[in-house]
UniProtKB/Swiss-Prot annotation:
The gene is veA. It comes from Aspergillus parasiticus. This is Developmental and secondary metabolism regulator veA. Residues 459-474, 482-493 have a biased composition (Low complexity). One of its GO terms (cellular component) is nucleus. Component of the heterotrimeric velvet complex composed of laeA, veA and velB; VeA acting as a bridging protein between laeA and velB.
Amino acid sequence: MATRAPLAPPPNETEASVSRITREGKKLTYKLNVMQQPERARACGAGAKSSADRRPVDPPPVVELRVYESDPNDDLNKTDITFAYNANFFLYATLETARPMAQGRFAPNPTCPVLTGVPVAGVAYLDRPSQAGYFIFPDLSVRHEGVYRLNFHLYEETKESKDANENAPIQSMSNPMPAKPMAPKSFLEFRLEVVSVPFTVFSAKKFPGLATSTSLSRVIAEQGCRVRIRRDVRMRRRGEKRTDDYDYDEERVYRSSDRFSTPDTHGYAGTPVERPRSTSTSTVDPSFPYGADAQRRSSGATEHGFQGAQPYQRPMPPAPVPAPVAVSTPAPPAPPAPPSHNPGYQSHLSFGSTQTQYPAPQLPPTPQSASTLAAPYSPHPSYSHARNPSTSAEYETPGYSYPSSRVSTERSSYPKNGLPPLRLEPPKPLNMPSGEPRSSDPNAYHSVAQSAGPRSQTPSSSLVPSLPPLKALSGDYPNNLSQPSSSISQSPSHDLGAGKKFLWDTGASLSKRSYEDSFGHDDRPLYNGMRPDTESHPRRLSDAGRNFYNETRDEMAYKRANGRMATKISPALQ
């Protein structure tokens, strides 16, 4: 079977030219050259989504136009008048199949146009790559796959009568109504046609991809024409599968895991080991920096109760012994902390250390005055919580020893008027050994609370204070608990002379500030349709009335977290 010979290309493929004689007897030659041929395209289909996923012909076709003028009898001497010629040019593109198809017996079904996009281009006069007129088609797409050609038709609109054809009738080229534009179709003339080389339109699965923009496209885009420029290769590789399409290679997995995983503390010697996170919320003592072999704090130990074995103990710094004071039992001298230490500067050990024991600090006697009582001092370095410094003597339970009593530091760090005036009764240290059994009678605890008062700066005769164990407080407290003045006056450990006053306000300030004291009459809440100008507001009890009312009624007494007793009016009575 003989093979069919390939079809000969049309005579006007890639290049085409035509000449005509003007009315003045000059010869004009038009020459079209397809400088950039279309190579590939992706079928966009004819459905509803075809316009959303439309791919242009790649690369965009570019057609060059040149106009020459010469004598009709001398074709060798031609002059390029492309820039000087006064006319408008349009190039219209159509699509045709590369191979002609035989016509069927039946009429074909009406179909939508295969070519879509912008098929018309105006001339652009550019200096590069050479001075000529260029037609660019950056937005041409084909709906169906196959092999096609682009057919370009040149149309001219003459502006001067001398440039019309030789046998054309004389018409007025001037517009009788300058304000109204003329219809250009009256002066459009078809000049010539040129076709491109065949190119293939692929389906979406077979499309090889878009190539980088050509140098001609870049040059045209640099001169202001609208051409899409692609700087990277977007060709699809066939045959072999890329190994980096999946995240299963070991290098990538290791690189991604190293950024977020915890470093191995048992790694190689050359690997730096980071300090592990601690469950403590206190600050770190700079005198004991963490090293590579630092132990992690046990996560099971509580911060305010039982504490496990500490990894190290803090030594006591040496300091001069204060002046001796006559006491019943001699106490070993304990140097105070350096002045630079403050209650907020603590080590990372939590409250209630059970492994280290330190004696109480021995302070020199100072005159008892109101200013002396309010002035704080720096106790020895304690292992209390950094955020909640303890302000009272710590409890002692059988089997454990706790640091001795410390003077409250909250009163010096906060203003006195910043908190509601509550009647606070700190427990008084008792002179009893740590191993002495305690009575289970609640009345004994009441007597201890009655004799509690503001501590003086003179040291007590006992080294370690003894307090009753933590127990659930009963609701029936005697009324004499709210009268610390009588109990304090009977206590031998307090010597209040004339002109001296208590550190705690024991007057008529048993509860929070009243609403009237804070906001006044106009800011009180209104109930049951009341108005601000009425006098039917329920008046609250005065301070004296509340004192009498509280003395005849039960008060709400509770023990604060630092160990001091506080009484407060019941919310139902306020």
